[in-house]
Curated annotation (Swiss-Prot):
UniProt keyword terms in alphabetical order: Allosteric enzyme, Cytoplasm, NAD, Oxidoreductase, Phosphoprotein
NCBIfam families in alphabetical order: L-LDH-NAD, PRK00066.1, PRK06223.1
Known role: Catalyzes the conversion of lactate to pyruvate.
EC number of this enzyme: 1.1.1.27
Assembly information from the UniProt record: Homotetramer.
Notes on activation and inhibition: Allosterically activated by fructose 1,6-bisphosphate (FBP).
Domain of life of the native organism: Bacteria
Protein's name according to its UniProt entry: L-lactate dehydrogenase
Amino acid sequence: MKISIIGTGRVGSSTAFALINAAVADEIVLYDLNKEMAEGEALDLLHATTFHKRMIIRAGEYSDIEGSDIVLITAGAAQKPGETRLDLTIKNAKIIKGISENIKKYAPNTLIINITNPVDVMSYVVWKVTGFESNRVIGTGTILDTARLRALIGKNCGVSPMSVHAYIIGEHGDSELAAWSSAMIGGVPIKGFCRNCPYKDNCNKDLSKIFDDVKNSAYTIISKKGATNYGIASATTALVESIIKNEGRVYTPSVLLDDVYIGYPAVINKDGVERTIDITLNDEETEKFESSKSIIKEYLESIKNLL
């Protein structure tokens, strides 16, 4: 299994390290415009393989991604404190277009996972420029947001996050929403669980506050350390594992719906996106989801001259 990573900044290098720990690849190729950084990361990561599965780790050129089973895109301008993901659109669209052209040239049969923000818009750019089938172009979408939601619900309600089934859908950004109508804890609708929870009298957070914490997580982290990297690296690795092992896990990646890439529940297997799963949304949630789609489409309109 050969995986290539385009971009070896914090996210790219953290993802490479997570992939090593997961032992899912036989070869990892790192590419970056800063060749010395890519070479340094490759050497450092190679040393880490001493304690894990034996694999090839090397820096390379675009031509070295040939034969890749999966290509991960992490390159792009960094999100600055106070800057929304959609503010990055024009800046990163040109970068992603060039990367996509090279992937199409050197690895036409690969499956692409885009991590670069704004992830929904950039995933659409990758899809349009490469001309690949939509199941082979996946964005990380709201996978990490969903994980954050489940973790915070679990902490607040005194249960394991693994027993929480709740989704963040829509844009990976300011217009995302929590699909509370379909949220469950241990098979019980979450609002029913809350009514019968023995800790309800001492609970100091309602559902909207939990969602606000999820929505602001990235901004909080960026304001304190400058970037988010470990969470998204783990989310990407989980996505890769479901593809490589053909596990059919359900995540909320950025997938093609109504000619727009957007975070939505989907089954992920060896072919990428096998299918989406329709979840129950009330009228308010449906309206918010459609609004989120419209926002992404507006930003796509702003870069249509590049595609």
